[in-house]
Amino acid sequence: MAIKFGPAGIGPVKTALEVLENYHKKGLKACEIAFTYQVYIKNEDDAKQIGKKAKELGIELSIHAPYYVNLNSKEKAKREATKKRILDCCRVGHYLGASVVVFHPGYYSKKGKDEFDREKTFETIKQGILEIKGEIKKHNWKINIAPETMGKINVFGSIEEISKLTNETGCSFCLDFAHILAREKSVDYEKIKSLFQGKIWHAHFSGIIYGDKGERSHRKTKHEEWKELLKNLPKDKEIVIINESPDMINDSVEGMKIYEKL
């Protein structure tokens, strides 16, 4: 097993190379570029330059798509806008040499006032993913998309749903272990290993505050939480762990050091 640790975020384009150098000096080997509100790397040459530097430093890049996406919106225009945002990430990601574009799949449709239509939601999101993958193939972009496990119970993204999407579309996946804990109130590592048998895992991890309805906010990752995660991860996979806590750089370094001592 090999695990690469790193934070979410690379900062503005003008300082991105310096940021990567800083991550490298700390021993970090992964970084997720957070396009939280927009795809702010516009220029193909900028993307190639950042990607070249990351490759030189042995840092694996990934992308997080904008948060304002929903492949299950009732409105076709919003579904199309979601696909465009994800595809914009894929185009830039191709030039960056990024491995995956992580995204939040969408919200559940409702059958009635209080009942989610999980089956219809799955089929709509699946169709959106297939259309996105078709565009990726058409453009010959070397990147995959990774729907993320989600931390709120009213949002599509249980481990079962993400696993099924992966199996039926060939998309990748992002296992957010903080989200899984918030949603399920515990993490069943054996079940996760059985559902996700691929050799490459992309994961998020941080401390999290949650309630009855799931995720509330991220917090600093505790030493004991890192140990619990790392001792339960499979030993036969290549794994990237992106930390999203308020202190994500130091938390990533701490996770790396704990892993080195296991």
Where are the language model's segments positioned?
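N-terminal pre-domain/capping segments
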Residues: 1-65, 69-71, 76-88
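Acidic-and-aromatic substrate-binding clefts and catalytic sites of carbohydrate-active enzymes
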Residues: 10-16, 35-46, 71-74, 109-111, ...
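Expand to "…catalyze enediolate/carbanion chemistry for C-C bond making/breaking, isomerization
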Residues: 15, 20, 83-86, 119-122, ...
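Gly/Pro-rich active-site loop or hairpin
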Residues: 159, 179-240, 246-247
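Active-site acidic/histidine proton-transfer and metal-coordination neighborhood
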Residues: 55-56, 72-175, 182
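C-terminal helical cap(s) of enzyme catalytic domains, especially alpha/beta-barrels
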Residues: 249-262
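Hydrophobic faces of well-ordered beta-strands that scaffold small-molecule active sites
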Residues: 3-9, 31-33, 61-65, 101-103, ...
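Acidic (Asp/Glu)-rich catalytic clusters
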Residues: 20-27, 42-62, 88-97, 130-140, ...
